[in-house]
């Protein structure tokens, strides 16, 4: 048996992981029941030679390249994110190592972002130093929602900004 799982434009790897665990329990029970009753239909699998292995996740893949388009960056972050919901992170699973970048030579892991409108188009970084921190792209901004500064615990952006002052001229790489 098979089952599709729906995703939205902000679903993270950890959220998909949890969703698949729940769906697989139901699917396994249905499969066992149908197998017992002789009602399972065979599904032809792809030829083994046609399958492509996923690449090993290397450190270079995790580094955010802000020269890419906003959707590629947002999707990289989502695809590597341990963020579940309400500041909760999936732990003990190597599939969610977090994408990262440098802010003034300090590594920042990014767990959650949203794509939003640009508020200040005159700089790469935009912040009010209280509520939001945006990285501006060509026509949209990437809102950093949940991050983990080097040597610190994960935190929402408001908590980060309480103890850190960001200037629009700060360097991201």
What are these model-predicted stretches?
Residues 48-173:
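Internal anion-binding site segments
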Residues 1-60:
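Donor/substrate-binding cores of folate-linked one-carbon enzymes
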């Amino acid at each position: 048996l098979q089952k599709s799982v729906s995703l939205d434009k902000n679903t993270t790897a950890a959220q998909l992981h949890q969703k698949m665990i729940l769906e697989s329990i139901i699917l396994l029970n249905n499969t066992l029941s149908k197998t017992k009753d002789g009602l399972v239909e065979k599904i032809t699998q792809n030829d083994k030679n046609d399958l492509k292995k996923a690449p090993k996740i290397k450190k270079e893949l995790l580094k955010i390249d802000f020269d890419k388009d906003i959707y590629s960056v947002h999707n990289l972050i989502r695809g590597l994110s341990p963020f579940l919901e309400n500041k909760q992170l999936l732990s003990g699973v190597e599939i969610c190592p977090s994408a990262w970048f440098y802010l003034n030579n300090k590594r920042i892991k990014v767990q959650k972002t949203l794509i939003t409108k640009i508020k200040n188009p005159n700089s790469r970084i935009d912040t009010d130093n209280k509520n939001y921190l945006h990285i501006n792209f060509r026509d949209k901004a990437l809102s950093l929602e949940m991050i983990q500064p080097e040597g610190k615990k994960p935190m929402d952006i408001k908590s980060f900004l309480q103890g850190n002052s960001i200037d629009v001229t700060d360097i991201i790489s």
